[in-house]
Amino acid sequence: MKVNLDRNSSGFCIGVQGTIHVAEEKLRAEIGLYSLGDVVHNEVEVKRLESLGLVTIDDQAFRELRDAPVLIRAHGEPPSTYETARANNLEVTDTTCPVVAKLQRTARQLHLLGYQVIIYGKPVHPEVIGINGHAANSAVIIKHADLSDPAETAPLDLSRKTALISQTTMDVPGFYQLKENLETLFRNAGNPQEGPWTEVRDIDITLGLTGMQPTAPHVYKDTICRQVSSRNSKLHDFALSNDCIIFVAGKKSSNGQVLYNICRDANPRSYFIEDTGDLDEGWLKEANGSPVGSVGICGATSTPMWLLEKVARHIESLER
């Protein structure tokens, strides 16, 4: 049985790499450090960092904390978090992913331009909560690109000028499907002659804020991280090239669920685990009991490479 470890499209994305590196540097310096929420959506990695001294706290504990160092993770935070930190004299180490920080700025500027902001994303995801905060908590959040949930579309004002953006880890096809469905929804509610929504650039937003250029009534900006989305096709091909796939990710990982489904669609013999203890040796065998020819080990943007290597070594040891 050949064990293939995917090093090209698995493991931490750049944003998470930065957060983990900063956390480790702080902890190595023996500086006490609190993390507002799980530093990454991978329980195994969180436990490793907690063993080094990281303390994970929730929103309530954060509001009660005083005079202490706090890490802002890659997902980012709403403005209210920073206001609380200043009021409580907290030393903030901000590791918000640069892609997310840019998206937060876009959401804030679109809101200032008077747009009704729509976020394609998951309402309870910390990144979306942060983005919405930068739009004064007024954004309409839509998870289902087919507009199948009436509760998601109920807050929409179809007479307002509107801007569509996205959580950075959502799927690209879904974003453009949502755009088309929103175009139809708004067209049917108002002007039947209205054309496609306008793609808005950073320069367009800047010119709009300065009053140098009028803004289109309905705009969209594809804010999905291409480093994340480019993994989709690569993992699809990786899953096809192996007899069996062991996908390693945390159960809380939104990106992990998306990538696992891609693997499973390409190869039905794809299995989701958090750590080696979840592995069923029967997955690695053919119907006649012989080992599969190859097993691929891959994971999410929140899965550390050391954990993928651990799983690969464990599987290799089963043949000895």
Curated annotation (Swiss-Prot):
InterPro entries: LytB/IspH
Record field: catalytic activity: isopentenyl diphosphate + 2 oxidized [2Fe-2S]-[ferredoxin] + H2O = (2E)-4-hydroxy-3-methylbut-2-enyl diphosphate + 2 reduced [2Fe-2S]-[ferredoxin] + 2 H(+); dimethylallyl diphosphate + 2 oxidized [2Fe-2S]-[ferredoxin] + H2O = (2E)-4-hydroxy-3-methylbut-2-enyl diphosphate + 2 reduced [2Fe-2S]-[ferredoxin] + 2 H(+)
UniProt keyword annotation of Iron present: yes
Known cofactor(s): [4Fe-4S] cluster
Positions with a binding annotation for isopentenyl diphosphate: H41, H75, H125, S253, S254, N255, S302
Annotated dimethylallyl diphosphate binding sites: H41, H75, H125, S253, S254, N255, S302
UniProtKB keywords: 4Fe-4S, Iron, Iron-sulfur, Isoprene biosynthesis, Metal-binding, Oxidoreductase
Key word Oxidoreductase present: yes
Function recorded in the entry: Catalyzes the conversion of 1-hydroxy-2-methyl-2-(E)-butenyl 4-diphosphate (HMBPP) into a mixture of isopentenyl diphosphate (IPP) and dimethylallyl diphosphate (DMAPP). Acts in the terminal step of the DOXP/MEP pathway for isoprenoid precursor biosynthesis.
Protein name: 4-hydroxy-3-methylbut-2-enyl diphosphate reductase
Lineage: Bacteria, Pseudomonadati, Chlorobiota, Chlorobiia, Chlorobiales
